[in-house]
Amino acid sequence: RQFRTRGATESIVCAVEAARERARAERSVTEPEIVLAESAHAAFHKGAHLFGLRTRMVPVTDDWTVDLDAMADAVGPNTALVVASAPQYPQGVVDPVAEIAELAAGVGASCHVDACMGGFVLPFASIEEPDAWGSPPWDLAVEGVTSISADLHKLGYAPKGASVILHRSRRLRRYQTFDFDGWLGGRYVTPNLQGTRSGLPMAAAWAVVRHLGTDGYRRLVRSAIETADRI
């Protein structure tokens, strides 16, 4: 259910494309929109620019999470994608993912969780400090979340050029794939924006993940938590 990409931007842009294709195929949406907080990563706007979606930005509240009332007002029949961040980049705050996913599901839209920063932190923070650092459910355990992105080359500690996008199902994943057989060269199928890709970044990421393992990531997250507490 996952595809490998070269970084957060590519993972996010692929999520935008998949959401647009799903909205077209399943709901006949012709003027697709993305609903996202003003704190969401700029790559969502890049994806909207590349794939012809309108963005509907909503404000954040005093605690830097998305204003759910404003988001509910922005979601509608043209919504292809609703965005949650875990965490968002500017302040490091996790959005209320369950509530956002519910808004998306209410109109049949996709919900992408940008966990490019938190994907290799939140699972282990919840183990180490469940009361102080644990977060409400933010991943595919949340009904209505259709895809997640996580960067191996950020707090997964792998070399640059390694990210993943994980879809809830194979059915949803196929909306990300470009499949074309209308030319003289045969079938052309790509799961992301690139054609030819090097396997080196993912081989290096695999080695790092195997080396660190669950215990290694727990130690690193514990160290980060202790440092944050001291600061």
Placement of each model-derived feature along the sequence:
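Conserved beta-loop-alpha segment that forms the PLP phosphate-binding cup at the N-terminus of a helix
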Residues: 1-28, 43-47
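Short acidic, glycine/serine/threonine-rich loops at helix termini
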Residues: 14-17, 45-50, 93-96, 121-128, ...
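PLP-dependent aminotransferase-like
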Residues: 24-78
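Active-site-proximal loop/turn and secondary-structure-junction residues that shape catalytic pockets
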Residues: 40, 88, 117-119, 154
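Active-site phosphate-binding strand-loop segment of PLP-dependent enzymes
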Residues: 66-115
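Active-site pre-lysine segment of PLP-dependent enzymes
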Residues: 68-70, 94-106, 118-147
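Active-site C-terminal subdomain of aminotransferase-like
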Residues: 131-231
